[in-house]
Amino acid sequence: MYQPDFPAVPFRLGLYPVVDSVQWIERLLEAGVRTLQLRIKDKRDEEVEDDVSAAIALGRRYNARLFINDYWRLAIKHNAYGVHLGQEDLETTDLKAIQAAGLRLGVSTHDDMEIDIALAARPSYIALGHVFPTQTKQMPSAPQGLEQLARHIERLGDYPTVAIGGISLERASPVLKTGVGSIAVVSAITRAEDWREATAQLLAIAGAGDE
């Protein structure tokens, strides 16, 4: 079977919100979330370093699994729990430096070919998306749906996986029934009428992850 070559993460990372500010990181940690990602796009390292550093410090205070999207140099510098990379970032990132620093690595995938590419890097977890149509970001690929997601899970076996893309409160349970280890959400929390209630309900379904 496939085995990660980066530091391990639990198979069940639980509810995995992806947010764009330190304010959201702090809110969600206080609400009981223990796996989350800071995703700030299209800024220079020096513009985001304070936010990255603050988010990592918060994650450490709560003993949480905080992943930094893309800014891998800053993640290494400030000793983050982990880094998350898109496919387009794999070729331009020093994966050996991330590994040597002891950081976990997550990689996005959208089809079988990208899963092959991710497996070659042997990251800590593989993100599978997008499951449903999403308004959060422009996607060149088509939604995979539950049947395709289940096929990927069967192929990957006990490799840690995260489903992402258009996962709402109503869709969370059907997604988890595919056998995927974790669910990543964005607008299900950040655009909810009551984000605290939405977070509590999603935590009740997906959990906060295994230790």
Curated annotation (Swiss-Prot):
Keyword S-adenosyl-L-methionine: no
Catalyses which reaction(s): 2-[(2R,5Z)-2-carboxy-4-methylthiazol-5(2H)-ylidene]ethyl phosphate + 4-amino-2-methyl-5-(diphosphooxymethyl)pyrimidine + 2 H(+) = thiamine phosphate + CO2 + diphosphate; 2-(2-carboxy-4-methylthiazol-5-yl)ethyl phosphate + 4-amino-2-methyl-5-(diphosphooxymethyl)pyrimidine + 2 H(+) = thiamine phosphate + CO2 + diphosphate; 4-methyl-5-(2-phosphooxyethyl)-thiazole + 4-amino-2-methyl-5-(diphosphooxymethyl)pyrimidine + H(+) = thiamine phosphate + diphosphate
Keyword Signal on entry: no
Catalytic class of the enzyme: transferase
Gene Ontology molecular-function annotations: magnesium ion binding; thiamine-phosphate diphosphorylase activity
Cofactor(s), by name: Mg(2+)
Record-linked Gene3D superfamilies: Aldolase class I
EC numbers for this chain: 2.5.1.3
Binding locations of 4-amino-2-methyl-5-(diphosphooxymethyl)pyrimidine: Q37, L38, R39, I40, K41, N69, S108, K137
Pathway annotation: Cofactor biosynthesis; thiamine diphosphate biosynthesis; thiamine phosphate from 4-amino-2-methyl-5-diphosphomethylpyrimidine and 4-methyl-5-(2-phosphoethyl)-thiazole: step 1/1
Pfam families (alphabetical): TMP-TENI
GO (cellular component) term, any one: cytoplasm
Top-level taxon of origin: Bacteria
Chain sites annotated for binding 2-[(2R,5Z)-2-carboxy-4-methylthiazol-5(2H)-ylidene]ethyl phosphate: T134, Q135, T136, G166, V186, S187
GO biological process annotation, one example: thiamine biosynthetic process
Protein name: Thiamine-phosphate synthase
Organism expressing this protein natively: Citrobacter koseri (strain ATCC BAA-895 / CDC 4225-83 / SGSC4696)
Lineage summary: Bacteria, Pseudomonadati, Pseudomonadota, Gammaproteobacteria, Enterobacterales
Gene that produces this protein: thiE
